[in-house]
Amino acid sequence: MNNIVLTLALVLGLTACGNNTAKNSSGTERQTAQNEKQNRVEVLYFHGKQRCATCMAIKKNAKEAVEAQFEEQLKNGSLVFKTIDISKEENEAIADKYEVTWSSLFLVRYQSGKESAENLTKYAFANARTAPDTFKQGLTEKINGLLD
């Protein structure tokens, strides 16, 4: 009985995180190509239609950290925070690019025409809800390292 309840809870939890796919759009590809011309760091928070408490904490705490610590960089465009709903057709290209199928957090650095991405999803799920200050501090340190 306990195994059935545990299994059901696990399945519902994973479903709530939004195991969705999206459709293709050339508009997103054009926008991505234009954005790659400027040196910058992007914080990309991906999500589906349904989000669990941890998924929502990732967005909330990531956005709070970025807005509190990087106001000047947000204004001058050297840092960008994007929320991307992977259940929308126009976001399929970017979701495919980073192989995202559920809630995820990436840091992407564009420097001299080259792109490097760091997947922080495991770190975010481990800390955003249960240790938000640790999450914010770690995210801030990672972003500072990429902005240098």
Stretches found by the model and what they are:
Residues 96-109:
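Structural micro-motif
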Residues 18-33:
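Short, low-complexity, disordered segments immediately C-terminal to signal peptides
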Residues 36-68:
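Local sequence-structure signature of Cys/Sec-based thiol-disulfide redox active-site neighborhoods
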Residues 13-16:
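C-terminal motif of bacterial Sec signal peptides marking the signal peptidase cleavage site
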Residues 2-8, 22:
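Sec-dependent signal peptide recognition
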Residues 74-90:
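Thiol-based oxidoreductase modules, predominantly thioredoxin-like and allied folds used
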Residues 107-148:
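Non-catalytic, surface beta->alpha helical segment in thiol-disulfide oxidoreductase systems
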